[in-house]
């Protein structure tokens, strides 16, 4: 029996073409729909679910993808989602926090549009189909497949504006490799809390620490509509003292604050006890989010709030 793979196209560079001027534009006719499938034992059913450049993707689109996957789970052996690369890691992480069915779910994209020299779209697409049809991928969580590498949704991030090897996993490295004849996995996905959301809403912005930062940036936020805040802090998790004071005032208003490091590698942890240091921030109630970048920490907090987590339960989830 061939493996039946559901392909959900959502737009992005992989579906686009460069025009005569060299500008990459959206195409109404997705070139991936015309790719002949040379892979034996794989039956592809493709659907143009969205046709959006990935900067237009919102959590509501991510949730719609989750609901579609749940709806079709009994009809397929795996899922491939083609997606623009700018926010691909966020959609992958969002899906990875949902109660996804036990099947391979793979996101892929392209750094070069379909008619550019050296286009990587078709190769990445076929690689994703290979992984989605592999039974060993079913217990790895949501995966990102690009440039012969397999990455865990939780850790992967886009690291280069144009290079085809843009997707990397800082600190941990890739979860597996795609070889000519086989697929090699180095690691298994870790167990985690998953949610089954029907709706998602809320305002959780991200601010980044910088030298000379004061409390003015936080003062610009509309606190009456603020559901939470993510801070990209210095180093192991430190901010200027003026910023720390303002964060404490948010916490006193029961507005949760999550902290990550702005460093590319490493993990945020409370080390320094000076004013604005991580020790003081954690004592005040700031959540130290391990191993996630700011954009994923934002989704984590947004999902937790929509799931109704509060108090110690919210802290345990955010810091777990």
Report the location of each language-model feature:
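Accessory alpha-helical/coil subdomains and C-terminal extensions
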Residues: 2, 8-12, 28-38, 152-231, ...
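A glycine- and small-aliphatic-rich helix-loop capping segment at beta-alpha/alpha-beta transitions
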Residues: 21-29, 93-105, 121-127, 158-164, ...
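Structural motif
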Residues: 77-78, 228
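Internal gly/pro-rich beta-alpha loop/helix module
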Residues: 107-178
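Short Gly/Thr/Asp-enriched flexible loops that form oxyanion-binding sites at enzyme active sites
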Residues: 84-103, 239-248
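Short beta-strand segments
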Residues: 8-10, 81-83, 106-109, 143-147, ...
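ATP/NTP phosphate-donor binding region
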Residues: 1-70, 245, 265, 288
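ATP/nucleoside-binding phosphotransfer catalytic cores, i.e., glycine-rich phosphate-binding loops
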Residues: 241-320
């Amino acid at each position: 029996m061939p493996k039946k793979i559901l392909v959900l196209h959502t737009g992005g560079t992989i579906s686009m073409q460069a025009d005569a001027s060299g500008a990459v534009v959206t195409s109404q006719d997705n070139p991936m729909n015309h790719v002949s499938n040379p892979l034996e034992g794989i039956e592809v059913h493709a659907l143009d679910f969205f046709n959006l450049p990935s900067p237009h993707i919102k959590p509501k689109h991510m949730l719609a993808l989750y609901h579609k996957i749940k709806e079709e789970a009994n009809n397929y052996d795996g899922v491939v989602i083609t997606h623009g690369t700018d926010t691909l890691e966020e959609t992958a992480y969002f899906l990875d926090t949902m109660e996804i069915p036990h099947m391979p779910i793979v996101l892929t994209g392209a750094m070069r549009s379909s008619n550019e020299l050296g286009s990587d779209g078709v190769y990445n697409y076929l690689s994703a189909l290979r992984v989605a049809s592999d039974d060993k991928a079913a217990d790895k969580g949501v995966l990102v497949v690009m440039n012969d590498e397999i990455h865990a949704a939780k850790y992967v991030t886009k690291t280069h504006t144009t290079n085809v090897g843009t997707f990397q996993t800082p600190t941990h490295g890739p979860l597996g490799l795609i070889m000519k004849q086989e697929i090699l996995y180095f690691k298994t996905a870790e167990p985690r809390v998953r949610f089954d959301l029907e709706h998602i809403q809320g305002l959780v912005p991200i601010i980044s620490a910088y030298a000379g930062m004061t409390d003015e940036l936080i003062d610009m936020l509309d606190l009456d509509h603020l559901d939470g805040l993510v801070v990209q802090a210095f180093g192991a998790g430190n901010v200027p003292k003026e910023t720390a004071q303002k964060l404490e005032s948010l916490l006193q208003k029961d507005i949760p604050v999550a902290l990550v490091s702005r460093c590319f590698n490493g993990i945020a942890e409370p080390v320094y006890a000076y004013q604005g240091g991580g020790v003081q921030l954690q004592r005040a109630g700031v959540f130290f989010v391990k191993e996630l970048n700011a954009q994923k920490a934002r989704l984590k907090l947004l999902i937790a709030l929509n799931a109704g987590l509060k108090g110690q339960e919210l802290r345990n989830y955010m810091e777990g």
